[in-house]
Curated annotation (Swiss-Prot):
One of its GO terms (cellular component) is chromatin. InterPro entries: GINS_A, GINS_bundle-like_dom_sf, GINS_Psf2, PSF2_N. Belongs to the GINS2/PSF2 family. This is DNA replication complex GINS protein psf2. Component of the GINS complex which is a heterotetramer of sld5, psf1, psf2 and psf3. Interacts with sld5. One of its GO terms (biological process) is chromosome segregation. It comes from the Eukaryota. Coiled coil: none annotated. Pfam families: PSF2_N, Sld5. The gene is psf2. The GINS complex plays an essential role in the initiation of DNA replication. Has a role in chromosome segregation and is required for bir1 localization. It is found in: Nucleus. Keywords: Chromosome partition, DNA replication, Nucleus.
């Protein structure tokens, strides 16, 4: 089946979340579970109340079955997010966040909000961070040249969102430069 051109060069948000499912996160199991051999790794025996690192997809599945509580990553603590938001608003550069921060936050907020303290404040702060970063990305695209675009510390979803625009802009810039060099 042929896909529209814009879908050929980027992933859907659902595909990005699927990829984020391979990121590791801490859980606290609610009961003892045997060692679990996976394709990519083996999850050791899980015993409550000891934390265990598992892929996000497994954490969400265990949460759904009430077999574990998800421990939000440190970067999702309200104080750290407030610092990141302030940094995003005060500086022209992007703050350092995990590569799949947006997808991970979306999955955690949608499927285990009851495991997150101050969840509504965290949602609001994450939205502020997202809007500040989108504004910076747009500004970066406006300042583009035909050779490169430097947007360090962008996350996977952010890169995926600007990829179609970036590709089109770069193609047009190359054509303009090529025409001006021919003249």
């Amino acid at each position: 089946m042929a896909l529209p051109r814009e879908l050929e060069i980027s992933f859907s948000p659902e595909e990005m979340e699927f990829l984020a499912g391979n990121e590791y996160i801490n859980i606290v199991p609610s009961e003892t579970m045997d060692q679990l051999p996976l394709v990519s790794a083996t999850i050791p025996i899980m015993k409550p109340p000891k934390k265990c690192r598992v892929p996000l997809w497994l954490a969400l599945e265990l949460k759904k079955q009430n077999l574990a509580r998800i421990v939000p990553p440190e970067w999702m603590e309200i104080g750290k997010l407030e610092n990141i938001r302030d940094d995003e608003l005060e500086n022209e550069t992007f703050s350092e966040l995990p590569f799949r921060w947006l997808e991970t936050a979306h999955l955690l907020l949608n499927f285990c909000a009851d495991d997150i303290e101050d969840v509504e404040d965290i949602r609001r702060i994450l939205l502020d961070i997202r809007e500040a970063r989108q504004s910076k990305a747009r500004t970066g695209l406006e300042a583009i040249n035909e050779v490169q675009l430097t947007l360090d510390n962008l996350g996977a979803m952010e890169i995926n969102e600007i990829r179609p625009i970036f590709r089109e802009v770069m193609d047009r810039m190359r054509k303009i430069v090529q025409v001006s060099q021919e003249e």
